[in-house]
């Protein structure tokens, strides 16, 4: 075999080796020759960039000036670079693109390896974290500022005013309770998220929980003038965590009592709690006949700190985390939360979870 044939064989072996190497990589990866043409690409790269074709210029498939400029610099300098690439079609995605030189036996840069790491989910989670911290800080700062203002007043102008002191201390107590509820909900949400991957398996009777929570909230319903009805006579045993499912029932029933006033102001307020089952699932639904929820609010109800009427929610002791907690609890139970509502026609919140294995059928 002459030298020319040997070099061709070596290049073929190297090409196959590189193709096999990137083929084993889980992230999109391509190899581009010094002429800018595609030499190899793995399956994830073809999925991300369907226009990729071996032997054609990379620019035809990848319309990313920053990445292509980095590729040219790497080919010229032999030093690796990392750039960000944002793709907006068909959906917005963000990639960290690493461009590394591939040297030939002579030491010359004959190609470059591009790997694309998807940062979309990490960036989304980071935005959620920042928003969450900002919202939590705001929710705590408001009552704290109020309490500090009353402390200044009590230490100053109202120092010797017994009537004002009693009034301000009552307000401070309520603001303190509000902060305590918020901290409790934040801690609960954190614990649920930490255990999200662990599915609870204890046999829990949803009917028993519904009756227990309804009995607990009966004084509140009476105070609010709400007729609370429970249809949960037969056991419906799901696989779950009792404390968490009690929390779910408390949130849904208490919300219905507090915010489900009759739309026409007639005073004919009622809340219906129903527990049912299918062959494989158990459900607890809470129906009110209040003002209902406008369609634009429905997709955002389970967002943390989202409120339809922030003033009303805070005045009734809401933290803005109740439905977020319900959603995460049901996700841990491999179940779901569904909401149906029409303005002026009330709302129904229902949670569904798989039956315990001993009660299926």
Give the positions of each predicted feature.
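Short helix N-cap motif at coil->helix boundaries in the Bergerat
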Residues: 206, 292-300
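Conserved catalytic submotifs in the C-terminal HATPase_c
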Residues: 202-203, 222, 227-236
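Short alpha-helical segment of the dimerization/phosphotransfer core of two-component systems
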Residues: 174-179
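PAS-family sensory/regulatory modules and their coupling/dimerization elements
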Residues: 57-121
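Sensory modules in modular signal-transduction proteins
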Residues: 7-45
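Conserved micro-motifs of the catalytic ATP-binding
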Residues: 194-199, 237-240
